[in-house]
Design a protein with these regions (language model features):
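Mid-to-C-terminal alpha-helical segments outside catalytic/metal-binding sites
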Residues: 208-246
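Short, acidic/turn-prone active-site loops that include or flank metal/cofactor-
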Residues: 11-13, 167-172, 198
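Short helix-capping segments at alpha-helix termini
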Residues: 39-41, 134-139, 185-187, 216-222
């Protein structure tokens, strides 16, 4: 499939974890076990560390989890803080988002941001962009806002941040729909596409399928290479830990 590396953000487990120790073990899995497992298949494995927005409603608990994150940011395969963001756009989620942005700034980390799904996406994206723009210390070039769709992609790119189009067979964005977005809004230098294995119907080969769709729509090989390889590498190489070459 042409995959060169795997980048895995800290994510919801399908259920809310009940202890800080549960998060500690999960972070160990991301930073110790998964790189070894991927290496058996000759794939470099990188990760992002955070408490995700679906588990950020309990402020006391979330802050206890945040306290253990800095030691994992030092791991050689951790690229930054993510995916932080919003789920239901609640006051508590905003508070934990802001505290994890501060954590990233304190440790000079890249930031990966999750935007809400369905009817909350536009409101949540606007709120996230406003929060980021209010802090002059934030370098937009070091922030990727993921899961953009037709009604949010322009907002993210025009604000100077990186935008991620997440590919799924049913939810989020199918490869043909993603290419529709590229034809409508252009293939920005701050845009990439990513696929993943989620809790719903997923296809980790969505990105190779998107490449086929791009070729069918007469995108040049240079444009395709920029979207699916050069752009991600440019963003990720801002972390000195990311070792793939352009």
């Amino acid at each position: 499939a042409g995959c060169k590396a795997v980048c895995e953000p800290a994510f919801w487990a399908g259920f809310d974890r009940s202890s800080v120790a549960g998060f500690y073990d999960y972070y160990r899995q991301l930073t110790e076990y998964e790189p070894k497992r991927a290496a058996r298949y000759y794939l470099p494995h990188y990760s992002w560390i955070c408490i995700n927005p679906k588990e950020a409603e309990d402020l006391v608990f979330a802050r206890e989890v945040i306290q253990i994150i800095p030691k994992f940011l030092e791991k050689e395969t951790v690229l930054g803080v993510g995916e932080i963001g919003l789920n239901k756009n609640s006051k508590n989620e905003v508070a934990i988002l802001e505290e994890q942005i501060q954590l990233a700034l304190d440790h000079d980390q890249l930031i990966l941001i999750h935007t809400p799904h369905l009817e909350d996406k536009l409101k949540g994206t606007k709120l996230i962009v406003d929060i980021l723009q209010q802090d002059p210390r934030i370098n937009p070039n070091k922030v990727l806002i993921d899961h953009v769709e037709e009604h949010t992609i322009r907002k993210v790119i025009e604000a100077g941040f990186w935008a991620g189009i997440t590919l799924y067979p049913e939810s989020k964005c199918t490869p043909p729909r993603a290419v529709d977005m590229l034809e409508q809004y252009g293939s920005s230098n701050r845009l990439w596409m990513n696929s993943a294995c989620d809790w719903g119907v997923s296809d980790p080969l969505s990105l190779p399928k998107a490449i086929l769709e791009l070729r069918k729509r007469s995108f040049s090989e240079e444009e395709i290479d920029r979207l699916v390889y050069q752009n991600p590498v440019h963003f990720l190489k801002q972390s000195p830990k990311f070792k793939l070459d352009i």
